[in-house]
């Protein structure tokens, strides 16, 4: 007998004709007491009491927020999602309300396309042909292959792929496969991330860390300048940044200037001024602003003398060449002899010189100024240089380490100190960049420290032979140059085993050899920490909303079973004799030691969330350094802000770099490859940049129908460029370059600079990879490059040149 749920009945469409039929049937029933409706049993069942419950959980995808969810459950199914309803919702102790992604989470949980059983690949990688197997066969296959590869190639041949589909949890997290591998000798690890590879590398040389003031500190500023920062789409929820920016600006009435190729949602209706800029040229703008600040005597010279190295001749390191300091570079007195004037920058950025002068004077006269940058500008082929150049504006004006100022990077967050599931120490010290794993599969033994950024040794001894792919669409969808990656993964004699653990048959899952069905975090117990939470830290104790359906299992159980098969010592080291529930209680207790006012475990199951305010009201990056640089030096060789980096000068002299790959000891502007002035523009005249789309978090939520309908996947194109190509809004267009091509709808809009196009990253690949390979899903990585950036060896996924044609 088919069971109809209340929700299904509510969704059913009722036409006038069907309503009349039902009414007639009802009249007939009244006329005959012997008549029994065929659905009368269902009606009686519906009248019977059904047990309902509500549990606290969280949305834990990689948006930088961790929003509280109240999941209402009936018949072991989530049928209604609330968000944070706790407290009085006063700013500073506000409710952590989810955005539309988190509020649609029941559609992910109840999605018919979720993985249900363990499977093994029976076709080619990427075909998506699998057959169902038992858990024992799956776990035995994984364990046998892992044991064989460790024996034949060593631990350096195993890699855990970057993945953030399950990111904010504690035990529902990539820490679990890390811990397993560290329990059995270690693995080839990585440095950097697809989010922040270039800026994290660059700031480590400049400040010794990548840290900024919390966004609530905008309440203390006079001016907000955002370079490529778009929290209204990337971190738009109550657990994110947009609410803080709005509330803080209400208190300070700060003027806000947005610098971005797109008129993004953060700008829309909120900004005082939008300055559209060519992608990848923010560094040139920053240098021209610096020229105005220096020539008009608006720099904070005492700050530069006391806290910095390399601004001028006085603080230039003794081993540096003469006139190698920043001031000389800006004024044209350095080796290149080019003054970085507003007129020079106007030709590069497309921002008029008079606008640059006006902006510079605003920055120089606003005391303090909150200068920040999102992670978009650094995700270019010159991203390391760009991020340092922007940060220099905060340094020049003395806005570092003070209330209302910032270090020039993305806004930071106070951390209350959640105890994390320990990964254990990795005995293997060799590392590769997060972005170069395809090279490590394809030609790993050719990768060196000076050409490919290998760390821990001069070169890799073995290629990657075993790949863990947990909650990761990076295997194909989120990695640069999909066509190249497809070719690398086709040869299964290179990477001999790929284990996927996921919720859906994503584009990446189709390339796995063994595929395991994971429970979602909302179906498990976990201790979840805030991330982009401003000055209000919080922790969520999530409880499972429903039972495990079909043969889905939690990752901790899966890897405990693998550990058991690898031997009793591995199993004991991995589990320490604890179940997942026991780990959560342990981690809660350790967190409570740091925060005694946090509710105990049983009480927190009821309250769901614990919130705590930053004791200093606002989090200020590098405050201690500013107050006493001798007692609190930065983690740089000099202990100061290194405007001139001797370490970068040495790297520039010793690394193997191509002509268009520049590492500079100063925060100088460098064009980068595949940029606005690349000769390739003669063939592919339009710059293409990516952006984080509000319908998805990377590729998470990319298969939710209501979000797809609300936010269709489109390529943004300016009316001038569209008219030249005969393109109208809504037309299907062909976007292509040497890397690949896609068919996608055109969004013709003046909200993007002429000569520039944009596609929201994270859309699911829909291409016949064994046919024409034309993508119909709008995955930007069919067009991006797998060539890494010079210093961080990170993903330059916003540096692209394309042509667009009407289909």
From Swiss-Prot:
Its Enzyme Commission number(s) read 1.8.99.-
Q: Where are the transmembrane segments?
A: none
Signal sequence extent: 1-45
| PTM | Exported by the Tat system. The position of the signal peptide cleavage has not been experimentally proven. Can also be exported by the Sec system.
Can you list the GO cellular component terms from the UniProt entry?
outer membrane-bounded periplasmic space; oxidoreductase complex; plasma membrane
- Which Gene Ontology BP annotations are present? anaerobic respiration
Where, if anywhere, are coiled coils annotated?
none
Describe the function of this protein.
Answer: Terminal reductase during anaerobic growth on various sulfoxide and N-oxide compounds.
The name on file for this protein is Probable dimethyl sulfoxide reductase chain YnfF
Q: Which gene encodes it?
A: ynfF
């Amino acid at each position: 007998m088919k069971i109809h749920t209340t929700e299904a009945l509510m969704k059913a469409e009722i036409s006038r004709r069907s309503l009349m039929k039902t009414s007639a049937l009802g009249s007939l029933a009244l006329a005959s007491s012997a008549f029994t409706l065929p659905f009368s049993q269902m009606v009686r069942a519906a009248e019977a009491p059904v047990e309902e419950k509500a549990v606290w959980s969280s949305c834990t995808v990689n948006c930088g927020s961790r929003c509280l969810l109240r999941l209402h459950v009936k018949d072991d199914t989530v049928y209604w999602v609330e968000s944070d309803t706790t407290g009085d919702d006063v700013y500073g102790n506000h409710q952590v309300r989810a955005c539309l992604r988190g509020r649609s989470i029941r559609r992910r949980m109840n999605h018919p396309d979720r993985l249900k059983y363990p499977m093994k690949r029976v076709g080619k990688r990427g075909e998506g042909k699998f057959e169902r197997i038992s858990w024992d066969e799956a776990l035995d296959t994984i364990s046998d292959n892992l044991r064989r590869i460790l024996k034949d190639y060593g631990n350096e041949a195993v890699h855990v792929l970057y993945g953030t589909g399950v990111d904010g949890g504690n035990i529902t997290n990539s820490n679990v496969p890390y811990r397993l591998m560290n329990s059995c000798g270690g693995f080839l690890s990585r440095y950097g991330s697809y989010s922040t590879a270039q800026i994290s590398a660059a700031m480590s040389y400049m400040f010794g860390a990548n840290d900024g003031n919390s966004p609530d500190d905008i309440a203390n500023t006079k001016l907000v300048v955002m370079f490529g920062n778009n929290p209204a789409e990337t971190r738009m929820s109550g657990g994110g940044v947009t609410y803080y920016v709005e509330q803080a600006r209400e208190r300070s009435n700060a003027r806000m200037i947005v610098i971005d190729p797109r008129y993004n949602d953060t700008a829309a209706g909120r900004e005082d001024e939008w300055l559209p800029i060519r992608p990848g040229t923010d560094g040139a703008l920053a240098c021209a602003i610096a020229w105005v600040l220096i020539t008009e005597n608006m720099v904070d010279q005492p700050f530069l003398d006391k806290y910095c190295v390399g601004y001028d001749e006085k603080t230039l390191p003794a081993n540096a060449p003469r006139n190698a300091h920043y001031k000389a570079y800006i004024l044209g007195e350095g080796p290149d002899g080019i003054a970085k004037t507003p007129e020079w920058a106007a030709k590069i950025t497309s921002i008029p010189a008079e606008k640059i002068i006006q902006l510079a004077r605003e920055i120089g006269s606003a005391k303090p100024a909150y200068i920040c940058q999102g992670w978009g500008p650094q995700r270019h082929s010159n991203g390391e240089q760009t991020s340092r150049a922007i940060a220099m504006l905060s340094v020049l004006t003395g806005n570092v380490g003070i209330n209302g100022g910032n270090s020039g990077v993305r806004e930071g967050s106070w951390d209350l100190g959640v105890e994390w599931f320990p990964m254990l120490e990795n005995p293997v010290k060799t590392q590769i960049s997060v972005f170069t794993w395809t090279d490590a599969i394809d030609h790993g033994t050719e990768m060196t420290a000076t050409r490919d950024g290998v760390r821990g040794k001069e070169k890799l001894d073995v290629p990657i032979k075993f790949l863990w792919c947990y909650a990761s669409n990076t295997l194909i969808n989120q990695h640069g140059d999909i066509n190249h990656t497809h070719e690398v993964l086709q040869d299964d004699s290179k990477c001999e085993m790929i284990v996927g653990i996921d919720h859906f048959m994503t584009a990446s899952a189709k390339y796995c050899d063994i595929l395991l069905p994971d429970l979602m975090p909302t179906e498990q117990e976990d201790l979840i920490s805030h991330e982009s939470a401003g000055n209000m830290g919080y922790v969520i104790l999530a409880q499972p909303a429903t039972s495990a359906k079909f043969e889905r299992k939690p990752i901790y159980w899966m890897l405990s079973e693998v550990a058991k098969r690898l031997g009793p010592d591995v199993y004991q080291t991995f589990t320490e004799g604890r179940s997942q529930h026991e780990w959560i209680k342990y981690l809660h207790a350790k967190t409570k030691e740091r925060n005694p006012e946090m509710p105990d475990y049983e009480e927190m199951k009821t309250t769901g969330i614990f919130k705590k305010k930053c004791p200093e009201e606002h989090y200020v990056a590098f405050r201690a350094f500013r107050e006493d640089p001798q007692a609190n030096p930065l983690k740089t060789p000099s202990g100061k802000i290194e405007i001139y980096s001797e370490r970068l000068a040495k790297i520039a002299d010793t690394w193997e770099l191509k002509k268009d790959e520049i590492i500079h000891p100063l925060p100088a502007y460098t064009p980068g490859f595949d940029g606005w002035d690349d000769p390739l523009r003669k063939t592919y005249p339009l710059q293409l940049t990516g952006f984080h789309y509000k319908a998805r978090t990377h590729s998470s939520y990319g298969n939710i129908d209501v979000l797809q309908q609300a936010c269709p996947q489109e390529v943004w194109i300016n009316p001038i460029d569209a008219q030249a190509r005969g393109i109208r809004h809504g037309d299907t267009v062909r976007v292509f370059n040497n890397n690949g091509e896609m068919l996608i709808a055109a969004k013709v809009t003046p909200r993007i600079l002429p000569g520039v196009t944009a596609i929201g990253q994270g859309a699911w690949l829909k291409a016949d990879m064994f046919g024409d390979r034309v993508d119909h899903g709008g995955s930007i990585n069919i067009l991006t490059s797998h060539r890494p950036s010079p210093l961080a060896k990170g993903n330059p996924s916003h540096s692209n040149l394309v042509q667009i044609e009407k289909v």
